[in-house]
UniProtKB/Swiss-Prot annotation:
Residues 28-47 bind DNA. The keyword DNA-binding applies. Residues 7-67 form the HTH iclR-type domain. PROSITE patterns: HTH_ICLR (PS51077), ICLR_ED (PS51078). Residues 82-251 form the IclR-ED domain. Part of the rhmRDTA operon involved in L-rhamnonate utilization. GO terms for biological process: negative regulation of DNA-templated transcription. This is Uncharacterized HTH-type transcriptional regulator RhmR. It comes from the Bacteria. SMART domains: HTH_ICLR. The lineage of its organism: Bacteria, Pseudomonadati, Pseudomonadota, Gammaproteobacteria, Enterobacterales.
Length: 260
């Protein structure tokens, strides 16, 4: 029997969803008998849950969970505290590489650090949690921009104020478009002293359950610490770390999907 509730209709709807999640697709009769819901009430709830896309009918006329639940779970996962999810993974990456690590996000066309992980052995870089980032001069900024929807990306690029901070800074939209295309192809970005001449950075994207960009991580060092040979090694480590965080958010790689 259902427990008493001040909102019995809501309780019964949740019980229906939990029942189908537990035993799989089932008929209206099974739902009514198992939960002890009056027939008229059950059909009202089932029809409303279908209308709201929480439920659907399969080819055998059994009720099954449907797309609205997937959408809601994706939103919930994407809003989980990224900092606490990422902190142990970034700490491990810092321990492995001996370099400073960041987690950054893009919001309303601007990028920010939301987590900085360092030790006494890492270099001192002018960064802090909450610091805004250049979207065209930093590795993590370019990474965040590379995976924006095309229209959003173009709008952001059109609004950029270009400043040549170092000899390697990108200073033209066409250069940036080419760089972003290269980043998407290789799966990671690189700051070749484009914001600070002596600083190098490798960054990789973090995705959610809907395969949408959620954040990016970066590994930062001096030009002596991150040479071309070590850069490629760091890229592999950064990608692996970013994928670990992505999986915690419900993301699945093509290999995960093939195995499931």
């Amino acid at each position: 029997m259902l427990e008493s509730s001040k909102v019995p209709a809501l309780t019964r709807a949740i019980d229906i969803l939990n029942l189908i999640a537990r035993i799989g697709p089932c008929s209206a009769a099974t739902i009514i008998d198992t939960l002890g819901i009056p027939k008229s009430t059950a059909y009202l709830l089932l029809n409303e849950l279908r209308r709201q896309r929480f439920l659907s009918l399969d080819h055998q006329e059994n009720f099954c969970l449907w797309t609205r639940l997937v959408e809601l779970s994706g939103h919930a996962l994407s809003k989980m505290d990224l900092r606490e999810l990422a902190r142990p993974r970034l700490t491990q990456l810092m321990d492995t590489t001996g370099l400073l690590c960041h987690l950054g996000i893009i919001d309303n066309g601007s990028a920010y650090y939301i987590l900085k992980v360092e030790s006494s052995a890492t270099i001192s870089v002018r960064s802090h949690e909450g610091k805004s980032l250049s979207l065209y001069r930093s590795g993590i900024g370019k990474c965040l921009l590379a995976w924006q929807p095309a229209a959003v990306q173009q709008s952001i690029i059109e609004g950029l104020v270009w400043e040549q901070a170092t000899p390697t800074t990108i200073t033209h939209p066409q250069q940036l478009h080419e760089e972003l295309a290269r980043i998407r192809r290789q799966g990671w970005s690189y700051d070749n002293g484009e914001d600070y001449a002596d600083v190098r950075c490798v960054a990789a994207p973090v995705f959610n359950a809907n395969n949408e960009l959620t954040a990016a991580i970066s590994v930062v060092g001096t030009r002596l610490q991150i040479n071309e040979e070590y850069r490629d090694y760091l890229a592999g480590k950064a990608i692996a770390c970013a994928r670990d965080i992505s999986r915690l958010l419900g993301w699945k790689s093509p290999f995960d999907l093939q195995a499931s």
